[in-house]
Amino acid sequence: MFQLNAPYRPTGDQPEAIRQLVDGIRSGAPAQTLLGVTGSGKTFTVANVISQINRPTLILSHNKTLAAQLYSEMRQFFPNNAVEYFVSYYDYYQPEAYIPTSDTYIEKDLSINEEIDRLRLSAISALLSGRRDVVVISSVSCLYGIGNPQDFSQSCISLVKGYTQDMAQLLTALVNSQYVRNDNELTRGKFRVKGDTVDVFLAYSDYILRIEFFGNEIDGLLTIDPVTNQVLEEFDSYNIYPATIFCMNPDKQAEAIRQIKLDLANQVQYFHDIGEPLYAKRIEERVKYDMEMIQELGYCSGIENYSRYFDGRKPGTPPYCLLDYFPKDLLVVIDESHVTVPQIHAMYGGDKARKDNLVQYGFRLPAARDNRPLTYEEFEGKTGQTIYVSATPAEYELKRSEGIFIDQLIRPTGLLDPEIEVRPCDYQVDNLMEEIRLRVAKEERVLVTTIAKRLTEELDEYLRRYGIRSAYIHSEVDTLERIQIMEDLRKGLYDVLVGVNLLREGLDLPEVSLVAILDADKEGFLRDYRSLTQTAGRAARHPNGKVILYGDKITPSMKKTIDETNRRRSKQIAYNTEHGITPTALNKAIESSPLIALMRKEQAEKAALEQKIHDSWKSAPWQQYNKKELEKASEKQRRAMLEAAKNLDFDTAARLRDEWLLMEDKLQAME
């Protein structure tokens, strides 16, 4: 089961917190709250609880950046266990919508991050493998529909060395599991056949599974490094999980389409009855086109809006989500619960309002409403025992824990909560520049928070203009890029990081000695008590930690933050004095996030493959052709490209297109 790997033992009030949490879980407590200050080792406490309880665990975070940090830390604590990452795989996502006031229809537009898609599949595969030593770090993506776990499990291909297996049946099974055959370029989610060998680049892993046949018998099962082609490991049996989370059971397709057509007829009749023939015509054309695509290709754009039919669910029932892939006795840890819980509450309402317009005006069938996130009540119904973790828990968490919370105020390093100073807003940027230069001289880092994305970018540009090595992050900065920027801050490539609300909960940056909060007296969402306390906590991992609140008045939130910080400081000072502890800096190794390493590896492999293809073009026979010969070859290449696209072999079509464009460039140069 779980094997905790840590170079240190629980200290301070960690042992008592671990004991209380473990006792609470074993006694059947439905919910507990861990009130732990920044830097007190809440993640280490949770890791100890997981290792003692030995249950599959879901750790829920409210944004991708913090989820990535938790993923990195948990991988270090549990190197021999399955630590997985499940967040939204969209780099960009514009949902389908209709705005009645301007009669504007917005089509769905998206960009999928293949690496995060692989990690999501890896999480699903680990849960369905039957392993109990699984920790999944997730964002609110775990609330959204991802397909029936039974269909996903049935699409799994089980292989056993020495058993009879017809190769043709295996290839058909791979296609049904959404793998694509490509004998030229073997990339993630594809397979190739060479003689008696089938190579499958697993969609959820970074290696190739080689299946060797001797007649109709499986003679070997090996994993291969895709770059070096070296054998990594041999197996007696192996399970191949599908290449996509959304698996359609062929047996359910006919019944699903019959039900869709029935609901379509009812909806068309409804629109005619209320005197809206335009909406009736619109929904009829759209759904019939989608049905033709599904029957011909097995999918259509926006197929998720028909998920209820293919899942076999009744109207109004919750979609299958990540939680359905866990066993019933899962443990749920909600990190920074004061933010995450309200976020879970908000997911359903926003989605419903958008879907209602699409249904009301004839763009989607009513079943589209069932492709949605869980309501909070549904989420609670699917979760097991829960631990809420926060430095500033809200009333809801305390109520669920029956008013009892577990304090964790003492840091193992003896570090105190930072001193807080209030300064006027006049010339706040000039004053900030002086403070930054003092920290830069000591090789310390600075975090600055503003109240708007535009101000973040403008301040970053201003600091750079005066020679400060600055960077900024906000919601429009790509997930993996945010992680990279924070790593670069720790390494000293930047001295200052400017942000809005991303510089709050959970960010672990021990080199930061100063947190500056601009416009701290602007009472509101980003300047309430919890936001100020969480932001101030970013300076609590440094012995010289200090917080400057720039404001012309002291708001109730500012006063509460200062009072609570002073209360904690007094307790921490008393504990240090009693035990003879001298506060010491947290020497945390700067280790690259595994997500960054995976991203770099993927980029290197892609670049190497592209270079190999381009090198082959340099020595291609057409490079020696005269103009007439090249024109003929170019036209032949163009036809081959169109034929490949017609056959839906888009990888081959793209490769042919790139070579054809080179031919066209050479033809233009000849003129």
State each model region's role.
Residues 26-33, 55-56, 132-134, 444-445:
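Pre-Walker A (Motif I) flank of P-loop NTPase domains
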Residues 27-49:
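Walker A/P-loop
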Residues 86-431, 435-441, 454, 460, ...:
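N-terminal cationic and glycine-rich segments that engage phosphates or anionic surfaces
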